[in-house]
């Protein structure tokens, strides 16, 4: 299997023009003009067989193939923000409304797309996965399928695809989500820390982009630490605030400057006792101990700089000076 260095993202400038082209199509049926808006090599219009009976192409190629029944494509998966309007029987077509953007949650579609691809291949049918240019959304969905099917990591899947379709370029947001998918062993469950913390960081992205608090926040129940874990307890009343399962890790920005690398905060995921304060809808505020009401920390949905100089977003912070970190014995 090819190593990580076998592929590198290309054509990053295409992503913004793809969004513009799909936006244009929402108000016009001028398909050719929309295609002309995106300048990419003609080679990306090729039909690429990634593994037996599994193909990737651009939208232009997909439209031509399904209209002529060329190559014998039986099932088509469309990953576009607009309806691709393909002449495909409904039961043989899956349209996932996905944008090629830095905020799009594509993880939520992996299970559905994996099942669609697996079903088609189980019937010895040919399945085509396409987006607008055939370099980002379609590649990400096929990579997720290959990762789960072959127990591959992200780089192995993308190297495999790149060997068969040169010039792939999943956007940075999609790459992060593929890596979370691998870290979660191809499962999406809020009990899994990598997935939970990825969702949490999306809250901060939302707050920065929209200048308001996210409307739906998932709260963890306060649970006692397991053997060997840390338990954070209010220094004044000993109330258990969190276990190390819900710590949000970050690395000091400048490890060579010791005076600034000592973190004075514990950053946490949302925990049930925070809910009354966070549901006030403020972008920032303070945390009081739910038992003794003494101040223990603060929060800033749009992020704050830790004393170690690292930026943390969102920031739900407990001051280390206000709690005791106790390691639970077995």
From Swiss-Prot:
Q: Which residues form the Tyrosine-protein phosphatase domain?
A: 45-187
Keyword Cytoplasm on entry = yes
Q: What class of enzyme is it?
A: hydrolase
Which residues act catalytically here?
131 (phosphocysteine intermediate)
Q: Name one Pfam family in it.
A: DSPc
The entry's localization annotation reads: Cytoplasm; Nucleus
Keywords assigned by UniProt, alphabetized: Cytoplasm, Hydrolase, Nucleus, Protein phosphatase, Stress response
Q: Give the EC number(s) under which this enzyme is classified.
A: 3.1.3.48
One GO term (biological process): signaling
Major location, coarse class? cytoplasm
* GO CC terms, sorted: cytosol; nucleus
GO molecular function terms noted in the UniProt entry? protein tyrosine phosphatase activity; protein tyrosine/serine/threonine phosphatase activity
Name the chemical reaction catalysed here: O-phospho-L-tyrosyl-[protein] + H2O = L-tyrosyl-[protein] + phosphate
Its biological purpose is as follows: May be directly involved in signal transduction and/or cell cycle regulation. It is necessary for maintaining growth rate or spore germination. Could show both activity toward tyrosine-protein phosphate as well as with serine-protein phosphate.
Q: Which family does it belong to?
A: Belongs to the protein-tyrosine phosphatase family. Non-receptor class dual specificity subfamily.
Q: Which PANTHER family is this protein grouped with?
A: DUAL SPECIFICITY PROTEIN PHOSPHATASE 12, DUAL SPECIFICITY PROTEIN PHOSPHATASE 12 FAMILY MEMBER
Q: Could you identify this protein by its name?
A: Tyrosine-protein phosphatase yvh1
Source organism per entry reads: Schizosaccharomyces pombe (strain 972 / ATCC 24843) (Fission yeast)
- Give the gene symbol: yvh1
């Amino acid at each position: 299997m090819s190593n990580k260095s076998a592929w590198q993202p290309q054509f990053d400038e295409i992503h913004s023009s793809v969004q513009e082209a799909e936006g244009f199509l929402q108000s016009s049926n001028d398909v050719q003009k929309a295609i002309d808006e995106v300048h990419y090599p003609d080679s990306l219009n090729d039909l690429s067989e990634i593994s037996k009976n599994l193909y990737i192409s651009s939208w232009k190629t997909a439209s031509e193939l399904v209209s002529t029944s060329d190559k014998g494509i039986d099932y088509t998966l469309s990953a576009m923000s607009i309806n691709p309007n393909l002449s495909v029987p409904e039961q043989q077509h899956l349209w996932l409304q996905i944008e090629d953007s830095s905020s799009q949650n594509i993880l939520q579609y992996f299970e559905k797309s994996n099942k669609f691809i697996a079903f088609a291949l189980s019937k010895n049918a040919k399945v085509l996965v396409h987006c607008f240019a055939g370099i980002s959304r379609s590649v990400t969905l096929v990579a997720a399928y290959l990762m789960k099917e072959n127990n591959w990591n992200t780089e192995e899947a993308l190297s495999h695809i790149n060997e068969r379709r040169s010039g792939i370029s999943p956007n940075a947001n999609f790459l992060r989500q593929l890596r979370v998918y691998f870290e979660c062993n191809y499962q999406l469950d809020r009990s899994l820390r990598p997935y939970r913390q990825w969702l949490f960081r999306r809250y901060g992205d939302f707050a920065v982009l929209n200048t308001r608090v996210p409307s739906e926040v998932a709260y963890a129940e306060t649970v006692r630490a397991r053997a060997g874990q840390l338990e954070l307890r209010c220094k004044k009343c000993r109330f258990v605030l969190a276990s190390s399962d819900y710590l949000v890790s970050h690395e000091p920005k400048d490890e060579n400057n010791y005076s600034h690398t000592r973190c004075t905060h514990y950053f946490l995921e949302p925990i049930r006792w925070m809910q009354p304060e966070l549901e006030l809808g403020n972008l920032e505020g303070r945390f009081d101990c739910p038992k003794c009401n003494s101040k223990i920390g603060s929060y800033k949905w749009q992020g704050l700089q830790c004393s170690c100089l690292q930026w943390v977003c969102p920031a739900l912070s407990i001051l280390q000076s206000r709690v005791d970190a106790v390691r639970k014995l077995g």
